């Protein structure tokens, strides 16, 4: 499987992409995250893209960004993305999602991303 997903003890929902990932796999990950969200929960979501290869076309990235931003369960989510590169392969998705109201903060360190989600720094 191209991704793993779990709710950690600190209540962070963590998605790790391990491989080459296409549009359908990204949508499946979002759908699974939304199923974990409890009504009224302020979601803390950690998306680890440090070992992922993007197989989506530009059109699919734009479509996924819109899909991501349209999920009611993620409307007020606090989202951290971890990438291994200075230039994220996820930049189109994030830009389109941001334009549609979804916000994410990028990190190069898993530890920093977790600390931010837990409110240890702004």
Language model region names:
Residues 2-122:
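Amphipathic, Lys/Arg-enriched alpha-helical "gate/interface" segment within cytosolic domains
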């Amino acid at each position: 499987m191209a991704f793993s997903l779990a709710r950690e003890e600190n209540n962070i929902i963590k998605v790790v992409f391990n491989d080459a990932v296409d549009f359908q796999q990204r949508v499946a990950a979002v759908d699974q995250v939304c199923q974990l969200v409890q009504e009224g929960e302020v979601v803390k979501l950690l998306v680890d893209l440090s070992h992922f290869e993007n197989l989506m076309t530009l059109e699919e990235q734009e479509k996924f960004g819109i899909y991501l931003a349209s999920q009611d369960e993620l409307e007020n989510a606090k989202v951290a993305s971890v990438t291994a590169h200075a230039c994220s392969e996820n930049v189109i998705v994030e830009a389109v999602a941001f334009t549609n109201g979804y916000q994410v903060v990028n990190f190069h360190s898993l530890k920093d991303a977790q600390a931010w989600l837990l409110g240890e720094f702004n």
